[in-house]
C-alpha cells in the first residue's frame, strides 16, 4: 500500500512520539515469563500458551519462531508439558481442567487483572450481584466472568443498563475491564450510580494505570498533529480505545506495522503523531520512523505527559532462574 504514487521525498514533517507508549508492566511480565520458560525448560518440555499471550501479532509470531505453541483449549496441551495462561487471565473452570492434567502450569495473568478477579470473588462471597463493565467476548472479560459460578451481568454501553434485571438494589456491585476508555466508563458508572444509588464499586480504579496514561497522552497528541498512527493489533482492546480517542480530534489509524501506511494520506500533512498500545513492542514504532525517513525529512520530538516506573515480578517458580538468566 505504501509504495503507491507518492512523490514527496523532500517533504518536511514533524513526528511527535507519545510517551508513555507501548509495553505496560503486565505485558512486559507476561512476555518475560514465556521467554524465561523457553530457556528454563529448553529441550525438556514443550511450552504451550493458552490463547495469545498478549494481543499483538508481532509478539505472537516472534514467540512461535522460538518454539512456543499457542492453543485455544487446555486439552490441546500434551501431558508432561508446560502450560502458560495469557496476560488476560482465565476462568476458574479452565484452572480446574488444567489441575486434572499432568501439566506444569505458569500463570502470566496481569496482577491488575487478578485484582479485579479478587474483587468479583469478594463481592460474590458477600452476597452481591456483580456487574462487569466490559466487552463481551474479550479474553479478559471471559476470565473475569468465570471467577464465580453466579451469573455476572455484562454492561457494554449505556443502553445495557436499562435492561439490567437485579435481585436487590442494596446488594449490587460493579467492576470493570482493565483496558476500557476512561471517559466512556465514567459515563457508564455515573448512570449505574444514578439508577442504583447504593451500588458498590471501584469507580475508575480497575482501569489500569497504563491504559489511563496512554489515553491521556494520546488525547493530547491528537490535538497537536494532523494524523495519528497507533501501533497495535486489531484485537487489542486498549489499542482500539487509543484509536477511538485520537479519532475525536484528527485522522487516526490502528496499524500492525509500517507496511499498512499509505503515504498518499500524508500529502498535506506536516505533523504526524505516533503512539503504541500496551502490547505493542517499540521496535514497531522504530520501523515506522525508519520508513517515514526513507520518504521525507523527519524532525523527531517527544510528548511526555507522565513517567512510568511500575514493574511486576515473575511467578516464584521462575524467579530464581531469572537471577541467573536475562531474557532476550
Curated annotation (Swiss-Prot):
One Gene Ontology molecular-function label: 4-hydroxy-3-methylbut-2-enyl diphosphate reductase activity
Residues that hold [4Fe-4S] cluster according to the record: 24, 110, 208
Keyword 4Fe-4S in annotation: yes
Cofactor note: Binds 1 [4Fe-4S] cluster per subunit.
Entry cofactors: [4Fe-4S] cluster
Pathway terms, separated by semicolons: Isoprenoid biosynthesis; dimethylallyl diphosphate biosynthesis; dimethylallyl diphosphate from (2E)-4-hydroxy-3-methylbutenyl diphosphate: step 1/1; Isoprenoid biosynthesis; isopentenyl diphosphate biosynthesis via DXP pathway; isopentenyl diphosphate from 1-deoxy-D-xylulose 5-phosphate: step 6/6
Catalysed reactions, semicolon-separated: isopentenyl diphosphate + 2 oxidized [2Fe-2S]-[ferredoxin] + H2O = (2E)-4-hydroxy-3-methylbut-2-enyl diphosphate + 2 reduced [2Fe-2S]-[ferredoxin] + 2 H(+); dimethylallyl diphosphate + 2 oxidized [2Fe-2S]-[ferredoxin] + H2O = (2E)-4-hydroxy-3-methylbut-2-enyl diphosphate + 2 reduced [2Fe-2S]-[ferredoxin] + 2 H(+)
Keyword S-adenosyl-L-methionine attached: no
Enzyme Commission code: 1.17.7.4
Residues reported in the UniProt entry to bind (2E)-4-hydroxy-3-methylbut-2-enyl diphosphate: 55, 88, 138, 178, 236-238, 279
NCBIfam families for this protein: ispH_lytB, PRK01045.1-2, PRK01045.1-4
Function: Catalyzes the conversion of 1-hydroxy-2-methyl-2-(E)-butenyl 4-diphosphate (HMBPP) into a mixture of isopentenyl diphosphate (IPP) and dimethylallyl diphosphate (DMAPP). Acts in the terminal step of the DOXP/MEP pathway for isoprenoid precursor biosynthesis.
Family (UniProt): Belongs to the IspH family.
Entry protein name: 4-hydroxy-3-methylbut-2-enyl diphosphate reductase
Organism: Ehrlichia ruminantium (strain Gardel)
Classification lineage: Bacteria, Pseudomonadati, Pseudomonadota, Alphaproteobacteria, Rickettsiales
Amino acid at each position: 500500500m505504501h509504495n503507491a504514487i507518492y512523490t514527496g521525498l523532500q517533504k518536511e514533517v514533524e513526528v511527535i512520539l507519545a510517551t508513555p507508549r507501548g509495553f505496560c508492566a503486565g505485558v512486559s511480565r507476561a512476555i518475560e515469563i514465556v521467554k524465561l520458560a523457553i530457556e528454563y525448560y529448553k529441550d525438556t518440555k514443550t511450552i504451550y500458551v493458552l490463547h495469545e499471550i498478549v494481543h499483538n501479532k508481532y509478539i505472537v509470531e516472534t514467540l512461535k519462531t522460538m518454539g512456543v505453541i499457542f492453543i485455544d483449549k487446555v486439552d490441546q496441551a500434551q501431558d508432561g508439558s508446560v502450560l502458560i495462561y495469557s496476560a488476560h487471565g482465565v476462568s476458574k473452570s479452565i484452572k480446574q481442567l488444567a489441575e486434572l492434567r499432568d501439566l506444569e502450569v505458569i500463570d502470566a495473568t496481569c496482577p491488575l487483572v487478578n485484582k479485579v478477579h479478587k474483587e468479583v470473588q469478594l463481592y460474590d462471597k458477600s452476597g452481591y450481584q456483580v456487574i462487569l463493565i466490559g466487552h463481551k467476548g474479550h479474553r479478559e472479560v471471559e476470565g473475569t466472568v468465570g471467577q464465580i459460578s453466579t451469573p455476572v451481568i455484562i454492561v457494554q454501553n449505556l443502553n445495557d443498563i436499562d435492561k439490567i434485571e437485579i435481585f436487590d438494589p442494596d446488594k449490587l456491585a460493579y467492576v470493570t475491564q482493565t483496558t476500557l476508555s476512561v471517559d466512556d466508563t465514567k459515563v457508564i458508572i455515573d448512570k449505574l450510580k444514578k439508577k442504583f444509588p447504593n451500588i458498590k464499586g471501584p469507580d475508575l480504579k480497575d482501569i489500569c494505570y497504563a491504559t489511563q496514561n496512554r489515553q491521556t497522552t494520546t488525547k493530547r497528541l491528537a490535538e497537536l498533529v494532523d494524523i495519528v498512527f497507533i501501533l497495535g493489533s486489531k484485537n487489542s482492546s486498549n489499542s482500539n480505545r487509543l484509536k477511538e480517542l485520537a479519532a475525536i480530534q484528527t485522522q487516526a489509524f490502528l496499524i500492525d506495522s509500517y507496511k499498512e501506511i499509505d503515504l498518499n494520506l500524508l500529502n498535506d500533512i506536516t505533523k504526524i503523531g505516533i503512539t503504541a498500545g500496551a502490547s505493542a513492542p517499540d521496535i514497531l514504532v522504530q520501523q515506522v520512523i525508519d520508513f517515514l525517513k526513507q520518504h521525507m525529512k523527519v524532525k523527531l520530538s517527544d510528548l511526555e505527559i507522565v513517567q512510568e516506573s511500575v514493574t511486576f515480578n515473575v511467578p516464584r517458580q521462575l524467579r530464581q532462574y531469572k537471577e541467573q538468566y536475562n531474557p532476550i
